[in-house]
Amino acid sequence: MIMTTPLADAMSQLVIYDSLTGRKQSFKPLVEGKVGMYVCGMTVYDYCHIGHARVMVGFDMAVRWLAQLGYDVNYVRNITDIDDKIIARAAENGEEIGALTQRFITAMHEDATALGCQSPNAEPRATDYIDEMQQMIETLVSNDYAYAGDNGDVYYAVDSFADYGKLSKRNLDDMQAGSRVEVENDKRNPFDFVLWKAAKPDEPQWVSSWGQGRPGWHIECSAMSTKCLGNTFDIHGGGHDLQFPHHENEIAQSEAATGCEYARNWMHVGFINVDGEKMSKSLGNFFTIRDVMAKYLPETVRFFLLSSHYRSQVNFSDSALDEAHNSLSRLYQALKVVEQQKGQTLIVDDALINNAYASAPGQDFIKAMNDDFNSSTAISVLFGLARDINKASKVEDIESAWQLAQQLKALAQTLNILQQPVQQFLQAVIGEAAEDGLTDEAIDSLIIERADAKTNKNFARADEIRIQLKDAGIELEDSRAGTTWRRA
């Protein structure tokens, strides 16, 4: 007998916004039941910043949902370990390039793990694919899509590719008419881009048909993606800032070299602004993932990033992170009350997950995630469950509250939130605050817990929190509008 699950029909209902066509379209993989996904990864010369975190978490969320639907996902995310910035940073530090890149690769993996991201199935490094890059360049040159300059560089001739600009919706003639780009002596067109760079003193270099040199950035991804996933694959992703010129150039190179469509779907993660401004070191608003996680719990950061649709522009600020923390705490508090009433710890298994997706909230969750991975709407489903849990707990309908809590935790598993033991999460908030005195974030979290305790008639716990805050010099003032606080 064939077993069916609530997600059996959902696989065929997934729609993804394709940056190339500019519209949502039904997802139909090249091979039934399998997905090949390539995401442009990091150039490893520094610690990852909060923008990188959004790309990591956004595609981790997408991969998890595809897997939840039943797809066998081959997720490939590259590492650029040879680049002008890497060379410059190594020289500045007086550090070997290999040591520098490995140090930041290790740091990147630590950051991704802290944010709850799964490792990709493959993580190709550019320096391991030099042969494949050279082969692709040779094909482009032999087919008149590329040419060698007198200086030893090899360039891609953008005029040779009729569809150049189709991803970014740019017309080459218009670009040239409005261009102020100074034409390099060896370039035939100011928008021609380098495929192979002639060797410079004290830089890494490899033997090639055009002399000693190293690859350009764009050819790296074309060679690695097609080697790992084939000439055509299902999804290509990255940050919105890569759409032009990087992804545009990848299409031009790959489709000219193979004669095949490059990627079936293009996904781009939106920008992160900081306090309403573009993040940049010159503005002093540049934050690494480690900067942020020194102040906020990693799960809070993940929750913040998932609370907006992956394509939307997000404003990063302390107030936004505080709000995310308080919202996440409310979900954990709902679970805590139920566990206390039931006298058991919630444990999610496959049966519970199937039951959760069969429920009305589960169907709403599926609908949200199948609508271009809309994690924001999916999270609103979780809050609806939390409200129902609190209502049931308040009237001591313990069995209903327990069933709803099982649904909440099971659905949240797909987003990899709410999976810590409840007390571990709440103690982490209080523990961090205790190191330097209670932070505003920790105070707000305790006030939320106190309010929930009062709602559920756990007055002993409510008094404990009031006393704890009083001992820390925090005075509370209760009113019909809620609780406010001030430092004594």
From Swiss-Prot:
Cofactor: Zn(2+)
Predominant location category: cytoplasm
A GO CC term attached to the entry: cytosol
The entry's keywords: Aminoacyl-tRNA synthetase, ATP-binding, Cytoplasm, Ligase, Metal-binding, Nucleotide-binding, Protein biosynthesis, Zinc
Matches recorded under SMART domains: DALR_2
This enzyme's EC code(s): 6.1.1.16
GO MF annotations, alphabetized: ATP binding; cysteine-tRNA ligase activity; zinc ion binding
UniProt cross-references to Gene3D superfamilies, sorted A to Z: Cysteine-tRNA ligase, C-terminal anti-codon recognition domain, HUPs
Motif 'HIGH' region: chain residues: 42-52
Reaction catalysis annotation: tRNA(Cys) + L-cysteine + ATP = L-cysteinyl-tRNA(Cys) + AMP + diphosphate
UniProt-annotated binding residues for ATP: K281
List of residues binding Zn(2+): C40, C221, H246, E250
UniProt-listed InterPro entries: Cys-tRNA-ligase, Cys-tRNA-synt_Ia_DALR, Cys-tRNA/MSH_ligase, Rossmann-like_a/b/a_fold, tRNA-synt_1_cat_dom, tRNAsynth_Ia_anticodon-bd
Residue ranges of the motif 'KMSKS' region: 278-282
Lineage: superkingdom: Bacteria
Entry annotated with the keyword Aminoacyl-tRNA synthetase: yes
EC main group: ligase
Short name of one Pfam family: tRNA-synt_1e
Cofactor: how bound: Binds 1 zinc ion per subunit.
Subcellular location field: Cytoplasm
GO biological process entries: cysteinyl-tRNA aminoacylation
Tagged with keyword Ligase: yes
Family affiliation: Belongs to the class-I aminoacyl-tRNA synthetase family.
Assembly, per entry: Monomer.
Protein name in the entry: Cysteine--tRNA ligase
Species: Psychrobacter arcticus (strain DSM 17307 / VKM B-2377 / 273-4)
Gene that produces this protein: cysS
